[in-house]
């Protein structure tokens, strides 16, 4: 819904990047594979998303040149389910519009991202983004920098490895 809204209402302010967005939607496995192989060979570039800009090798290249990014988790409402998506935006100095874990504020301060749940529709969200002053924008970036430098240890590779190791030891010992 978000992609379609931006395509209709703010096409110059939105770009969609990534693999397979140029192929038709999900289809049953074998039939879908056949349809997708045909689509790839068509003499014209089929794409059901006009905002699709293509495949990129490094998402940071795009994120660094964008003020905001839509960061929707594949699963909404699952407590603690926070993926790399929001950190990709942080690493690029980009302000994420986040929708995912209901308890996101238990892990990441609310002044580091724009919570999509705070807007009743796409129009409200878009107006908020367009009306954001440079001072507000820079404040988000300062808060992100502070979080990354001082509070993000829970999301490091070392912490992840420690959690996995402890769980394995727990399983072995029981």
Could you describe each region identified by the protein language model?
Residues 1-114, 136, 151-152, 163-173:
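Nucleotide-sugar donor-binding catalytic core of glycosyltransferases
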Residues 122-174:
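C-terminal amphipathic helix plus adjacent low-complexity
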């Amino acid at each position: 819904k978000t992609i379609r809204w931006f395509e209709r209402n703010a096409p110059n302010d939105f770009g969609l990047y990534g693999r397979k967005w140029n192929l038709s939607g999900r289809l049953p496995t074998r039939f879908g594979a056949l349809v997708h192989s045909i689509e790839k060979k068509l003499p014209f570039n089929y794409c059901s998303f006009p905002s699709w800009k293509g495949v990129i090798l490094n998402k940071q290249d795009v994120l660094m040149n964008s003020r905001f990014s839509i960061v929707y988790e594949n699963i909404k409402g699952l407590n603690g389910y926070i993926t790399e998506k929001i950190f990709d935006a942080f690493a690029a100095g980009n302000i994420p519009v986040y929708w995912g874990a209901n308890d996101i504020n238990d892990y990441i301060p609310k002044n580091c991202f724009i919570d999509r749940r705070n807007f009743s529709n796409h129009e409200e969200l878009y107006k908020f983004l367009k009306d954001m002053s440079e001072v507000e924008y820079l404040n988000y970036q300062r808060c992100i920098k502070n979080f990354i430098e001082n509070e993000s240890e829970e999301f490091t590779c070392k912490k992840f490895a420690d959690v996995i190791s402890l769980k394995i030891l727990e399983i072995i010992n029981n």
